[in-house]
Amino acid sequence: MVGGVRIARARGPPIEPEELDDADGEALVRIARRAVEEWVEHGRRLDVEAGGKLGRPGAAFVTLERRSGDGWELRGCIGVVRPVLPLVEAVVTAAVDAASSDPRFEPLSREELDRVRVEVTVLGSMEPLPKKPHERPALVEVGLHGLYVEKPPYAGLLLPQVAVDEGWDPILFLTWACIKAGLPGTCWLREDVEIYRFRAAVWRETEPRGPVVRRDLAREAAAKGVNARVS
């Protein structure tokens, strides 16, 4: 038991997003919500059982958004990048950290719980992009891929929905992924910088404690007129 969470050994191969259905996604969002509320209200980490698909190793991010006027603003986003924990425990860890440890924000308060919606992103395996920089943009599709940039000691990750929400094309996506890693925006043009793409599945509450839906990022990108591929 660590911090009130039973850390079970993850069993089986890492889970891929396409293996999860909407019932799994809703369960993960509800668990993330409970983990946030348990931490904010009682200072305890949620104790969860890791079994079945959700007990396999998984990588996940939890995003918190607070209602602001007619829209939503980011309130916290942290994740477990590598599948080192059972998926359900990765979600609990990410949820607590998003509510308490995102360095961009103060810890979430009790008064905010009714105004915050929860989103869970399950990451797939990392696929390295070619070393030849000119080949990279054509292999990135906005609405399908997220990006992870690494040049030790620097590293940074952008979830696929970020590019959709911001309306970026693949080159802008690569540029901002480099910046996220603390590197120059042109770092994707360097062969010594490792860049990975990954797929993901995203579920979120439509409103605080409300229905849970899967985000269709490709459809969202098309509706916004995003240039999803390099022409």
UniProtKB/Swiss-Prot annotation:
InterPro entries in UniProt: AMMECR1, AMMECR1_dom_sf, AMMECR1_domain, AMMECR1_N, AmmeMemoSam_A, Uncharacterised_MJ0810
Domain AMMECR1 residue range list: 29-214
Superkingdom of this protein's organism: Archaea
PANTHER family: AMME SYNDROME CANDIDATE GENE 1 PROTEIN (PTHR13016:SF0), AMMECR1 HOMOLOG (PTHR13016)
Name of the protein in question: Protein APE_1056.1
